[in-house]
């Protein structure tokens, strides 16, 4: 079974862009984007639908996190593509328990490079996501399950130092 996650993330960005610019429902914005191969893959569709639903259902919360870290920017001034890349990555970090945060951030950076809405999109996306991730981690909001999903290096080092 082929993994389509990068392509699905790109399709999600395209769907979010369509939703932002046109008065259409989610199905209309997404159905034409998916290849038959993707649509026929239950795992691909599960990932796609879960991530789309998470972005839409939690958009206000996600946007609050973005606004908190873009205090010099009005949300309406952030490029639509960049804003939706941030939304997608944050939804993944917060609501996809099986995806490591570093993967979500890296995928967002790579997609920002590909879509390249501005010259500095990838750096902007990286900086904002890194700041939000650090806040969420400090607040204990990152809930991941499975090995390697959260970098526990700092906490291991702190435990090691306290045992001396």
From Swiss-Prot:
Transcription recorded as keyword: yes
An example molecular function term from Gene Ontology annotations: RNA binding
GO biological process: DNA-templated transcription termination; transcription antitermination
GO cellular component: cytosol
Pfam families noted in UniProt: NusB
Keywords on record: RNA-binding, Transcription, Transcription antitermination, Transcription regulation
Annotated CDD domains: Terminator_NusB
Highest taxon listed in the record's lineage: Bacteria
Gene3D superfamilies with a match to the protein in the record: NusB-like
Functional note: Involved in transcription antitermination. Required for transcription of ribosomal RNA (rRNA) genes. Binds specifically to the boxA antiterminator sequence of the ribosomal RNA (rrn) operons.
Entry similarity comment: Belongs to the NusB family.
PANTHER family per the UniProt record, alphabetical: ANTITERMINATION NUSB DOMAIN-CONTAINING PROTEIN, N UTILIZATION SUBSTANCE PROTEIN B-RELATED
Listed name of the protein: Transcription antitermination protein NusB
Organism name: Chlorobaculum parvum (strain DSM 263 / NCIMB 8327)
Gene (name only): nusB
């Amino acid at each position: 079974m082929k993994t389509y996650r990068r392509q699905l993330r790109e399709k999600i960005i395209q769907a979010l862009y369509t939703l932002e610019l046109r008065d259409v429902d989610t199905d209309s914005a997404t159905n034409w984007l998916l290849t038959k191969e993707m649509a026929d893959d239950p795992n691909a569709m599960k990932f796609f639908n879960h991530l789309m639903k998470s972005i839409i259902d939690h958009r206000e919360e996600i946007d609050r996190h973005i606004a908190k870290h873009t205090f010099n920017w009005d949300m309406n001034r952030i490029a639509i593509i960049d804003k939706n890349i941030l939304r997608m990555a944050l939804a993944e970090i917060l609501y996809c328990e099986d995806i490591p945060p570093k993967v979500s951030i890296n995928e967002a950076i790579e997609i920002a490079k590909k879509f390249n809405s501005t010259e500095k999109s990838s750096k902007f996306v990286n900086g904002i996501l890194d700041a939000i991730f650090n806040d969420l981690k400090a607040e204990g909001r990152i809930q991941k399950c499975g090995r390697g999903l959260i970098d526990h290096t700092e906490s291991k080092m702190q435990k090691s130092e306290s045992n001396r």
